Design a protein with these regions (language model features):
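Bacterial N-terminal signal peptides that target proteins for export
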Residues: 1-9, 119-120
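Bacterial N-terminal signal peptides
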Residues: 9-18
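N-terminal targeting leaders of membrane proteins
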Residues: 18-120, 125-139, 174-200, 271
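Divalent metal-coordination and catalytic microenvironments
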Residues: 63, 87, 165, 206, ...
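Interfacial segments of alpha-helical transmembrane regions
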Residues: 81-82, 135-161, 165, 228
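Alpha-helical transmembrane spans of integral membrane proteins, capturing the lipid-embedded, hydrophobic core
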Residues: 82-86, 90, 126-129, 151, ...
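Transmembrane alpha-helix/helix-exit interface in multi-pass inner-membrane proteins
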Residues: 94, 158-179
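Membrane-embedded catalytic cores of phosphoryl/pyrophosphoryl-handling enzymes
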Residues: 179-271
């Protein structure tokens, strides 16, 4: 019972930081110019600049919005979406001890796991922004280059709160638990050290990165209807692979997807 209460508190703490307001300005599209790309709409002054040189300052600006978001809850705003996500996460956490043993025992996903291994999914996630940037450089297309730069910013901005939360929760991965072990006693037990980047932890870092990148491409190329479906479909496969590989529980993946999407959609692409 105490473990369940801790799970809900952790989920509430994370989601209260990372469910930014939906009442944001519309998504801006950049002008096709040389130098640092700007984000604007016709007839409006530039809203921001994006470049590799500005990446650190942009990430710091994003972090300010992420970590100050709980202040909006104190003023009575955004309680409905935050509460909904907290309850959804708590429900998945309660189901984790029942779903994890199935993926430990089944051999159904052996081939799937070989294809979407740890290293292969990293390569898959890196391929899209690297390709976009390379094509943009060759074609002198600042929009394509900015897409890659925004993807890098989105991943960094979402992974920072994810890493902090992983260090606080210190959750074991399903693979750390013996086949007949207790899949409920997973919180505050990992001894993998601060800022650990490997398997395990709440939330899933792979899923955070996958949905951050997917959201950038899905929104910046949303007029091509196949792009959002492909981007989120591939991100979903990356997240699912973390479960089948026994690297994460389903709740880790769910919160990773929420975190990657919300930080990218409501903060990185909205200012």
């Amino acid at each position: 019972m105490e473990v369940s209460r801790r799970s809900v508190l952790i989920a509430a703490w994370l989601l209260s930081m990372t469910v930014p307001t939906a009442a944001q300005s519309p998504l801006f599209y950049p002008n096709q110019t040389s130098g640092p790309a700007t984000t604007s709409t016709p007839g409006e002054p530039p809203q921001r600049q994006v470049s590799w040189k500005l990446l650190p300052s942009n990430v710091l600006h994003d972090q300010k919005q992420v970590w100050l978001f709980p202040a909006s809850l104190a003023h009575g705003r955004h309680w409905a979406p935050t509460a909904g996500l907290v309850f959804a996460t708590a429900g998945l956490v309660a189901l984790d001890p029942h779903t994890a043993p199935y993926f430990r025992q089944t051999q159904t996903f052996n081939q799937f796991n070989r294809v979407l291994s740890f290293n292969n999914t990293l390569a898959l996630m890196a391929a899209a922004p690297i390709t976009a940037y390379a094509v943009g450089r060759v074609r002198h297309d600042s929009y394509s280059q900015q897409t890659a730069e925004l993807a890098a910013e989105a991943v960094l901005s979402a992974e920072i709160p994810a890493l902090v939360t992983r260090d606080v929760a210190r959750r074991l991965s399903p693979g750390d638990i013996p086949p007949n072990g207790n899949f409920s006693a997973t919180w505050f037990r990992s001894q993998k050290g601060p800022f650990y980047l490997g398997p395990g932890g709440f939330p899933s870092g792979h899923t955070v990165a996958a949905f951050s990148i997917a959201t950038v491409f899905a929104e910046r190329y949303r007029r091509r209807r196949w792009v959002p479906w492909t981007a989120y479909g591939l991100a979903g496969l990356v997240g699912f692979s973390r479960v089948t590989l026994q690297a994460h529980f389903p709740s880790d993946v769910f919160v990773g997807a929420v975190l990657g999407y919300t930080v990218t959609h409501y903060i990185v692409l909205r200012r």
